[in-house]
């Protein structure tokens, strides 16, 4: 047996960041078994240290000349590195905001962190999976861990209800997605690698067959569930309202990023022959998500439900970059997910702090908060205004890049719809900000009138403060200093070969569509000679 050949085919060094997360997960469980409840004081910091070590390992893998591992099952290219970094960073910030919250709920912190690390592991593997079996295993690891996290506070009936709904709808979407990829397997002649699937379908000459279209629709249904796109969003409001707040913070960023990573890799690699069809479907999803998410958010009275519908709308904005299919489109998509990480987690950190001190998440109860807790008011205001796209915050530049990429790609009416729905979203974000900064004492809510003294020295509150300050600074400065982040996003696209091939073929197809129009214009104009004769 040639072990050197086997080692070169496995290329296990590519998944070193995931290996570090696995070791961190095992370390958390072992330390908890040995020390018991006394480990809760610092076990969260152990997990955060492991996640940041994983991010450092990702940094050193940038522009890896040999990113393929597990005989083609995993691709550690620069695109996957960015998405894996987003997921790991979102998990680290989630742990910061979870320590006090989980302790107050009376549930073990070590088990919570272990399940969260499992979800992180699934999301990181999903970001680079380039083979059907790897995709399914990674997707299930992320999904099952998410179900467990959603129902982690067993004493809360709302958490149990949210977990059951999430499980039932998630299992159904997984079954639909699995049926779609099984059709791909059959149409390609038994191939499981995404690139081999495309070649197999082209060889079998079934590029426009009904079976391939059905496979595409079912695959998009599974992806739509993961990114909370309408009309696959039914689980989102109930799960966001009932699940523990740190869990939905991770789902809104880490799980969504993994879903978009899967969408890019699966659709561009396995479905190149029906590229126009999947772009049309995603255009419909983007329109529905932007309209439904922003309009329904206007009527919400719960802060978490409002952010649930906001998350649906944000998915619609990100899809503009995917539909554009250009270098600028994919780069703006990744840039927006990077800044969305900071502004969304900043908002959820503030919601956790408010709920810990008042026991409610009703929007009306935030009235007059500025007079009792200026830092929390500032953090939540910056996060909401950034989500709305107010300059000069990070969300403004994220939306500008997305809309510019869409306009350059000819998606004029989709960009105009995005602008209109952005204006709608600004209304319900500013409504909350205005409510928090009222000055009249009689306008204060009962929760704010009875607001406890702000103390950061209580157990578990210092990590929350650190998480709030870090995400607040990042949200405030990521827009003004956006060039490094956009360069990172742009380089991740430029250094990913399969995506460059997809972009070039899309540009060539667009040019071929423009040629007849240019010919007709040139034929309609009189030549110089004929004009001279006249």
From Swiss-Prot:
Q: Name one Pfam family in it.
A: Ndh2_N
Q: Which GO terms describe its cellular component?
A: plasma membrane-derived thylakoid membrane
Q: What is its EC number?
A: 7.1.1.-
Q: Which InterPro entries match?
A: NADH-Q_OxRdtase_suN/2, ND/Mrp_TM, Ndh2_N
From the broadest rank down, the organism's phylogenetic lineage runs: Bacteria, Bacillati, Cyanobacteriota, Cyanophyceae, Nostocales
Report which reactions are catalysed by this protein.
Answer: a plastoquinone + NADH + (n+1) H(+)(in) = a plastoquinol + NAD(+) + n H(+)(out); a plastoquinone + NADPH + (n+1) H(+)(in) = a plastoquinol + NADP(+) + n H(+)(out)
Sorted alphabetically, the Gene Ontology BP terms of this entry are:
ATP synthesis coupled electron transport; photosynthesis, light reaction
The way this protein sits in the membrane is described as: Multi-pass membrane protein
Chief location of this protein?
A: membrane
Can you name this protein? Answer: NAD(P)H-quinone oxidoreductase subunit 2
Quaternary structure (record): NDH-1 can be composed of about 15 different subunits; different subcomplexes with different compositions have been identified which probably have different functions.
Similarity annotation: Belongs to the complex I subunit 2 family.
| Record's subcellular location | Cellular thylakoid membrane
Q: Which UniProt keywords apply?
A: Membrane, NAD, NADP, Plastoquinone, Quinone, Thylakoid, Translocase, Transmembrane, Transmembrane helix, Transport
Report disulfide bridges, numbered on this chain.
none
- Function according to Swiss-Prot or TrEMBL: NDH-1 shuttles electrons from an unknown electron donor, via FMN and iron-sulfur (Fe-S) centers, to quinones in the respiratory and/or the photosynthetic chain. The immediate electron acceptor for the enzyme in this species is believed to be plastoquinone. Couples the redox reaction to proton translocation, and thus conserves the redox energy in a proton gradient. Cyanobacterial NDH-1 also plays a role in inorganic carbon-concentration.
GO-annotated molecular function: NADH dehydrogenase (ubiquinone) activity; quinone binding
């Amino acid at each position: 047996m040639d072990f050197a050949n086997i080692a070169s085919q496995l290329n296990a060094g590519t998944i070193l960041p995931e290996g570090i997360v696995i070791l961190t997960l095992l370390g958390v469980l072992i330390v908890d078994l040995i020390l018991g409840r006394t480990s809760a004081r610092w076990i969260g910091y152990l997990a955060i240290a492991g996640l940041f070590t994983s991010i450092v390992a990702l940094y050193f893998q940038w522009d890896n000349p040999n990113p393929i591992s597990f005989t083609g099952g995993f691709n550690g290219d620069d695109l996957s590195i960015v998405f894996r970094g987003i997921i790991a960073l979102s998990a680290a910030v989630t742990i910061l905001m979870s320590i006090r919250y989980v302790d107050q709920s009376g549930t073990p912190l070590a088990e919570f962190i272990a399940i969260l690390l499992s979800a992180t592991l699934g999301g990181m593997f999903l970001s680079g999976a380039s083979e059907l079996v790897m995709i399914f295993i990674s997707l299930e690891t992320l999904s099952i861990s998410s179900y467990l996290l959603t129902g982690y506070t067993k004493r809360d009936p709302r958490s149990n209800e949210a977990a059951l709904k999430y499980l039932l709808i998630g299992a159904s979407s997984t079954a639909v997605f699995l049926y779609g990829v099984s059709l791909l397997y059959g149409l390609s002649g038994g191939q499981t690698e995404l690139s081999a699937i495309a070649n197999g379908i082209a060889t079998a000459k079934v590029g426009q067959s009904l079976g391939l279209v059905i496979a595409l629709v079912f695959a998009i249904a599974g992806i739509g569930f993961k990114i909370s796109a309408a009309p696959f969003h039914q689980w989102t409001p109930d799960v966001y309202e009932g699940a523990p707040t740190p869990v939905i913070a991770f789902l809104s960023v880490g799980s969504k990023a993994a879903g978009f990573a899967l969408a890019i890799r699966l659709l561009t690699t396995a479905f190149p022959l029906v590229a126009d069809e999947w772009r049309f479907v995603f255009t419909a999803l983007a329109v529905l998500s932007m309209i439904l998410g922003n309009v329904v958010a206007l009527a919400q009275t719960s802060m978490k439900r409002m952010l649930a519908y906001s998350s649906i709308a944000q998915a619609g904005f990100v899809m503009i970059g995917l539909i554009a299919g250009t270098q600028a489109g994919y780069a703006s998509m990744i840039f927006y997910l990077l800044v969305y990480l900071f502004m969304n987690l900043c908002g959820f950190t503030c919601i956790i702090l408010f709920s810990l001190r008042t026991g409610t998440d009703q929007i009306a109860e935030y009235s007059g908060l500025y007079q009792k807790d200026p830092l929390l008011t500032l953090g939540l205001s910056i996060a909401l205004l950034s989500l709305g796209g107010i300059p000069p915050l990070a969300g403004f530049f994220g939306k500008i890049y997305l809309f510019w990429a869409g306009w350059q790609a000819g998606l004029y009416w989709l960009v105009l719809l995005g602008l209109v729905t952005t204006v709608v979203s600004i209304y319900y974000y500013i409504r909350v900000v205005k409510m928090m900064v009222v000055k009249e004492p009689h306008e204060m809510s009962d929760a704010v009138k009875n607001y406890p003294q702000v103390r950061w020295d209580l157990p578990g509150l210092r990590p929350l403060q650190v998480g709030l300050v870090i995400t607040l600074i990042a949200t405030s400065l990521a827009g003004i200093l956006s060039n490094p982040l956009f360069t990172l996003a742009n380089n991740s696209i430029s250094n990913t070969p399969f995506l460059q091939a997809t972009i070039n073929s899309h540009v060539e197809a667009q040019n071929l569509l423009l040629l007849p129009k240019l010919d007709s214009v040139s034929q309609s104009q009189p030549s110089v000679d004929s004009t001279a004769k006249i």
